[in-house]
A protein has these predicted regions:
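Residue-level recognition of short, well-ordered coil/turn positions
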Residues: 42, 125, 179, 228-229
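Short alpha-helical interface elements
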Residues: 40-42, 58-62, 144-145, 173-177, ...
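Alpha-helix boundary recognition
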Residues: 38, 121, 175-176, 225
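A metal-dependent hydrolase metal-coordination microenvironment
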Residues: 2-130, 138-139, 144-147, 152-170, ...
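C-terminal functional module detector
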Residues: 1-12, 181-182, 189-313
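Catalytic-core region of carbohydrate-active enzymes that cleave or remodel glycosidic bonds
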Residues: 150-209
Length: 313
């Protein structure tokens, strides 16, 4: 029987799930963000200003959905901030009009952060762990975290600022450790350059494609919750399904497509140039998960979530 891992029906909506405005330390107003992201084909932006949750109902329209979110930071007290390890996490609200967050004590401690994550998740929030390399964090800092929904596999702002926006290895560690987190690619834009043609522009570099029934808050949030999405800096994962123990993927033209697992039982196809658009993989019964990665000749990469073996066989 054919089982779609990305829904057969619905529409892919382009989303930036990490954004800052003048409401914290960004340079653009929320309305400016809406117009600039609409012009680049985005339909969803999570307004995740620092340490304050602000709904933006005035931005809702038939072609644009603002997600209500907040980014919370926890800084290690043992070093100056420039050298300190930090936790930064986004919390996406299930209620578009929510304007208060879960009470918490700001303590740099994995158990304290996990406690907040679990309490936020109990209230319906989706919790995303952000930019581990920029945060100077080690595996021991993020692998024990509880309550995570998403993992930021790419962050444009960190890549522009310090060339450390990728977290693909850290994401792989999470997968191997049994964490079934959803990968996201985000901008974390602050728009300090205030010029989209500038080499310092930190918008439009990484995005998440969410497949949902419609562009309503409920449908987008539920699709995110179910992991019906993928992260990318370029390539598209257009179809993904499993049938009779074989996974199938259809992509935009790519130069490499991989099925990656909990072990070395993997399968990759490669080409000179972007001439590949599909691949298939017989799922070994003893692996713990399978995920898809694709790459194009421009250096763009796409990541599916890790599909647990129980979802595939």
């Amino acid at each position: 029987m054919k089982k779609y891992l990305l829904p057969e029906s619905g529409t892919f909506y382009k989303a930036n799930l990490h954004c800052h405005t003048v409401c914290s330390d960004g340079r653009y107003t929320p309305e400016q963000i809406k117009q600039k992201y609409l012009a680049e084909g985005y339909a969803v932006v999570a307004f995740s200003d620092h340490n304050r949750i602000l709904p933006h109902p005035e931005l809702r329209s038939d072609d644009f959905l603002p997600l209500t979110a907040i980014e919370i930071d926890f800084n290690a007290p043992t070093e100056p901030w420039s050298h300190a390890s930090v936790y930064h996490l986004n919390y996406f609200s299930p209620d578009p009009d929510r304007d208060t967050f879960v009470p918490f004590e700001r303590v740099y401690d994995v158990d304290a952060v996990s406690d907040l994550n679990l309490r936020a998740a109990k209230e319906g929030f989706l919790v995303q762990y952000n930019h581990p390399r920029w945060s100077f964090q080690q595996a021991a800092d993020f692998l024990p975290l509880k309550g995570l929904w998403g993992f930021e596999v790419y962050n444009t702002g960190c890549e522009i600022e310090m060339q450390n926006g990728w977290a693909d290895y850290e994401f792989e560690l999470c997968c191997r450790a049994g964490m079934r987190v959803v990968p996201t690619a985000t901008d974390d834009n602050h728009n300090v350059a205030m010029d989209e043609a500038s080499p310092y522009n930190d918008s439009f570099g990484g995005w998440s494609m969410i497949k949902a029934a419609s562009l309503t808050y409920a449908d987008i949030f539920e699709a995110m919750k179910r992991g019906e999405m993928y992260a990318t800096t370029g390539p598209e994962i257009r179809e993904l399904w499993v049938e009779n123990g074989v996974m199938h993927v259809v992509t935009s033209p790519c130069c490499a497509i991989s099925f990656l697992t909990s072990g070395r039982e993997t399968s990759t196809v490669r080409a000179h140039g972007d001439s590949l658009t599909e691949h298939r993989f017989a799922v070994p019964e003893h692996v713990k998960f399978v995920r898809v990665q694709a790459a194009d000749a421009n250096g763009g990469r796409a990541f599916s979530r890790p599909y647990d073996i129980s979802e595939l066989l």
